[in-house]
């Protein structure tokens, strides 16, 4: 598979065209950003760890019946995947209150929610990724039909129902996570982007230790070791 022109560069990945018009290559970067790009750094090896973690989790979800853009991991930092039309909605799934949920609503940090919360954010850096309700999404034309929003919620809950017990078996609480979706060439809504400690919060069940990008956000240090631990637990059968 030939890697061709750079199409887009985001905070964590570069996107390249290939010699197949239906396939793209994502290059996972070592860059770190937080607070909508206000805090920046890098961590050698972070991109490769996220690529490997995402690969394993995409495989798990595919086996469980979730359609994703995943094709295969090409090397440490490169992932081959289907080309999609990105839906500009970030789907946030929350099992335990922390971060903005605790800050904005006054829910005590670490509170286990009585049911899984699914929220929508507008994927728009210039606006700071504001919260969306269904009417906002439809007015903005981010989707065409209410049924598509319903499907995003349904898929997000299905993914949570797979990943939450999976990580519990690995000694990790899946606190919350962000998902992105796109439409494939047939118009099917599928999971895209990545699933990694960059966009998931993992807390060790026994110690409560944070094993995700909060180590960078909160200046805790030890980010690479935490990501390596997450990958090690995933690979342990």
From Swiss-Prot:
- Any one GO molecular function term: ATP binding
A single GO BP term for this record reads: cobalamin biosynthetic process
| SUPFAM superfamilies according to UniProt | SAICAR synthase-like
* N-terminal signal peptide: none
| InterPro entries per record | SAICAR_synt/ADE2_N, SAICAR_synt_PurC, SAICAR_synth, SAICAR_synthetase, SAICAR_synthetase_CS
Task: Give the EC number.
Answer: 6.3.2.6
Q: Which UniProt keywords apply?
A: ATP-binding, Ligase, Nucleotide-binding, Purine biosynthesis
> Its pathway?
Purine metabolism; IMP biosynthesis via de novo pathway; 5-amino-1-(5-phospho-D-ribosyl)imidazole-4-carboxamide from 5-amino-1-(5-phospho-D-ribosyl)imidazole-4-carboxylate: step 1/2
Entry coiled-coil feature ranges: none
Report the catalytic activity: 5-amino-1-(5-phospho-D-ribosyl)imidazole-4-carboxylate + L-aspartate + ATP = (2S)-2-[5-amino-1-(5-phospho-beta-D-ribosyl)imidazole-4-carboxamido]succinate + ADP + phosphate + 2 H(+)
Gene3D superfamilies in UniProt: ATP-grasp fold, B domain, Phosphorylase Kinase, domain 1
Family annotation (CDD domains): SAICAR_synt_PurC (cd01415)
> NCBIfam families of this UniProt entry?
purC
PANTHER family membership: MULTIFUNCTIONAL PROTEIN ADE2, SI:DKEY-6E2.2
Q: Which family does it belong to?
A: Belongs to the SAICAR synthetase family.
Q: What is this protein called?
A: Phosphoribosylaminoimidazole-succinocarboxamide synthase
What is the primary gene name for this protein?
Answer: purC
């Amino acid at each position: 598979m030939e890697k061709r022109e750079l199409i887009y560069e985001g905070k964590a990945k570069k996107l390249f065209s290939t010699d197949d018009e239906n396939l793209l290559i994502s290059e996972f970067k070592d860059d770190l950003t937080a607070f909508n790009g206000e805090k920046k750094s890098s961590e050698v090896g972070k991109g490769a760890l996220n690529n490997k973690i995402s690969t394993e989790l995409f495989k798990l979800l595919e086996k469980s019946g979730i359609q994703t853009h995943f094709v295969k991991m090409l090397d440490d930092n490169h992932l081959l995947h289907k080309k999609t039309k990105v839906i500009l909605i970030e789907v946030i799934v929350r099992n335990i209150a922390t971060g903005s949920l605790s800050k904005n609503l006054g829910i005590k940090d670490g509170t286990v929610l009585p049911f899984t919360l699914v929220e929508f954010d507008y994927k728009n850096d210039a606006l700071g990724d504001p919260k969306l309700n269904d009417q906002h999404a439809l007015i903005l034309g981010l989707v065409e039909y209410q049924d598509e929003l319903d499907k995003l919620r349904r898929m997000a809950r299905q993914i949570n129902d797979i990943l939450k017990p999976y990580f519990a078996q690995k000694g990790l609480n899946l606190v919350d996570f962000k998902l992105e979706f796109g439409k494939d060439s047939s118009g099917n809504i599928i999971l895209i982007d990545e699933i990694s400690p960059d966009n998931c919060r993992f807390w060790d069940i026994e110690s409560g230790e944070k094993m995700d990008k909060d180590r960078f956000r909160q200046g805790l240090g030890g980010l690479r070791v935490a990501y390596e631990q997450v990958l090690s637990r995933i690979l342990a059968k």
